[in-house]
Every structure is written in C-alpha cells, then in structure tokens.
Design a protein with these regions (language model features):
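Aromatic-rich peripheral "rim/lid" segments of glycoside hydrolase catalytic domains that contact
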Residues: 165-257
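Active-site region of glycoside hydrolase catalytic domains
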Residues: 4-123, 131, 140-161, 183-184
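Context-gated lysine
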Residues: 1, 64-67, 130, 134, ...
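Surface-exposed, active-site-proximal loop segments in enzymatic domains
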Residues: 1-2, 34-44, 121-124, 169, ...
Length: 257
C-alpha cells in the first residue's frame, strides 16, 4: 500500500515538473523509518529491505515513460532514516532500471555528529581534535561506501543546536564540517527548523523569520552570522575532492553544475 501511495504521489510530481531542467532534483523520501518503535532510528534488516524497496519504487515511477527531463534527472535516495552510520549506509541497495544500475542516482545522508553537541544540549563545547575525528569518520565512511565506487553523495541535513548561545563553539563545528565536506566532495545542506530557543536541543534556527511588523527590517536575516561565516572559512580551507583519489576527484568535476 505504501508503495502504491508513493507511486501515485511521485507520478504527479514528476509530471508537473517534467519540463524543469536538471536544476530540479527529486528526493524520494525524508528520513523514512519505523516511527514509534524502539528501533526507530537504528532499524533492522526488515527496515533496510523496506526502504530499498521504496527507493526502487520511486526510481521506477520517475524513469518509467519519463517525460521531459525525467529520463536523466538526478534522483536522491536515502537509506533507512537517512542515516550516515556504517551499518545503515552499507545496507543501501542502489536502484536498477532494466536490470542495470540506474543512472544519475545520488545517495542522501543526514549527519549530526557528535549528537550530544549537534542535537542535544548535554555538550556545549566542540573539541576540534576529538569531535573532529568523529566527523571525519562519517565522511571517510561515505568515501569508502559510495564515493570510491563513483556514487555521489549529498549530506541533505546537518547542523548544530544552539545551546545557551554557544556560537563560538558552533563555529568550530561548522568549520570542521565544511572543511571535510570540501575535501571529500560532498555538498551539505544546513537544517533550519525555525526553533529560536536556546535550550532543550534541536534549536536549529538560522534565518530570522520576523512576524512582528516592528521587526520587518530584520526579516530573513541570518541569525548567527559567525557560524555561517565559519562554514565558508572551512570550505575555503581545502580543495574540492582533495581527500579522494585523483581519478575520482576529476570525475566529480563532471557532476558539478
């Protein structure tokens, strides 16, 4: 039934956006998981198989009788819960078309590492050496699992929660993540959930969305510019794809727009 619903939804989306060029990328699902179960975020073999099935349904829907740009459009697929863990990423089965590996598939992962700093409010400081090693392991796993096989990856969500205004510490995190993303050739998307609180975890507001008319001049401004500035500094500190093999780094250039 879920497969039928996914097909019906994506058929409408695909038809509507068929004539939009390759700047439009479709992502089949967002953090698909067994909500409410004690294994909601870790999953198991049955969970992994279910998501692989739904990813195949998604690709079949877009590629079958494809109109406009849909025959070659880039399609993003997540693993279970969009995890970036070694177990979760290893379980991802790439979709096929007519028995061959589907073209223009991008794996989507989400990463909030270390979780005690990025999602919760139990860790207020970021230690570049210790915590940076955790971030590096995430990207190294992405490299070994996908990039070394010529499979592109987008980190579709990442971020660090605001804990009592620890913006200098978040800036250290931002620099580290952006530097790794640049070195491994993995685009990242910063998650903004609009939560402007300063405690309780998952306070991921980055853009000010003012509703008070007196604050209209501040609307859509960046809330924590020092953290976003650190992202650019991290990006500019390394060459794109420099952690990859020479062949892979050259191949990456062909998928950049």
């Amino acid at each position: 039934k879920i497969g039928e619903q996914l097909t019906a939804m994506w058929r409408q989306i695909a038809d509507t956006f068929a004539d939009f060029d390759q700047h439009v990328i479709f992502e089949g699902m967002n953090e698909p998981r067994a909500q409410g179960m004690n294994y909601e975020w870790s999953g198991n073999a049955a969970c992994y198989a279910a998501i692989n099935y739904l990813n195949q349904v998604f690709v079949n829907t877009i590629r079958k009788d494809a109109k406009g740009y849909n025959a070659e459009r880039c399609l993003m697929i997540p693993g279970y819960a969009a995890t970036s863990s070694p177990a979760g990423t290893a379980a991802i089965a790439l979709p096929t078309v007519d028995g061959e590996a589907a073209a223009n598939i991008i794996v989507s992962v989400h990463s909030y590492d270390p979780q005690t700093f990025c999602l919760q409010d139990t860790q207020t400081t970021f230690e570049p050496e210790k915590d940076g090693a955790k971030i590096n392991r995430v990207f190294e796993n992405i490299k070994e699992t996908f990039l070394d096989r010529g499979i592109p990856v987008v980190m579709g969500e990442t971020g660090a929660t605001n804990t009592n205004g620890n913006h200098d510490e978040r800036a250290k995190w931002a620099y580290c993540v952006a530097q790794n993303a640049q070195r491994y050739g993995v685009p990242i998307v910063i998650w903004d959930n609009g939560n402007n609180q300063t405690s309780g975890g998952e306070c991921h507001a980055w853009i000010r969305r003012a509703v008070n008319p007196k604050l209209r001049s501040q609307a859509t401004s960046v809330v924590y510019p020092q953290v976003l500035d650190a992202l650019w500094e991290g990006k500019n500190s390394a060459a794109w794809g420099s952690a990859l093999t020479e062949v892979r780094a050259e191949a990456d250039e062909s998928i950049l727009w």
